[in-house]
Amino acid sequence: WFRAGLSVALLGYLASQIDMAETARAALAINPAHLLTAVALVVVDRVLMLSRWLLLVRRAGMALPLKSAVWVYLVGSYLGNFLPSGIGADAARAFVLARRTDRGIDSVAMVAIDRYLGLYSLALLAVVGLVLWTGQDNADLQRWSIALAALVTVGAGAFLWADRLLSLFIPAAWATRPWFNRASRLAEAMGSYRRYPSLLGALTALSLVVQIVRVAQAYVLGEGLGFHVPFSYYLAFMPIGILAILLPVSIGGFGFGQGVIVALLRPVGVPDVQSLAMSTLYVLMGVLSTLPGALLHFRSRSRGLS
């Protein structure tokens, strides 16, 4: 309820600062060809995300038919709309998968790996975008960007060694505590993915493509609304906007994510009305992309399935 209230409060603040009627008119006036292109990119995004999920399910060795694996992903994505953004869909997916396989720790670990690779690729893309936007002639920026990319990569790699880090830095007296036992089992399950470097490489590549597709979606929406900002700037700022949408401080990314995108487009001269229209369309498309999961969910409920 707190996050729902925060989303409403942030939307109310945006409404007090920006003409919402003008924003609605701007959104409705979007070029149809650009809108259809953005919809197509959302479909590509979902297909790539589902492919990544199926790779994880197969590697985890879960006794789950392809149809059920697809069902878990789509329904989990839909149920995540009613939970805090970012972690909501992950939590729902882990819960549904655990119920279907009776492998709770492995389910949570698989979802955590999926999310961590997504965040890593997002951070890496932001660094690349920063370099492209500010120009390659700045040697200091290039060095700092390479250092930042290396730091992000090392930090992401440490996640896969969480089991070893726990054993090294957690006091032995905590070993008998129930929460530590659960944390250790989860860390071991995540650490097991170290044995599959080719899988991690494929998943990381898919994650990078997904993030580029999402940035391209925002770019296409902006072009369709009539403001022209270089794609290199989208590569620099949109990963931050996507992260704001994913943070568990709002429902579905409404309010906070929109406000961040509006603020990030101001330095390049985009009017607030247009940037709010773009961010609203972007968030709405994300919500609407979960409709297949909604249909599967209600169909299962009508049949008495879980």
Tell what function each PLM region has.
Residues G76-S85, F237-Q258:
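Transmembrane alpha-helix interface/packing and boundary motifs in multi-pass membrane proteins
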Residues A89-A98, I251-P267:
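Re-entrant/interfacial helical elements at transmembrane boundaries that shape
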Residues K67-W71, S85-D90, R100-Y116, V270-L281:
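Membrane-interface alpha-helices at helix entry/exit sites of multi-pass transporters
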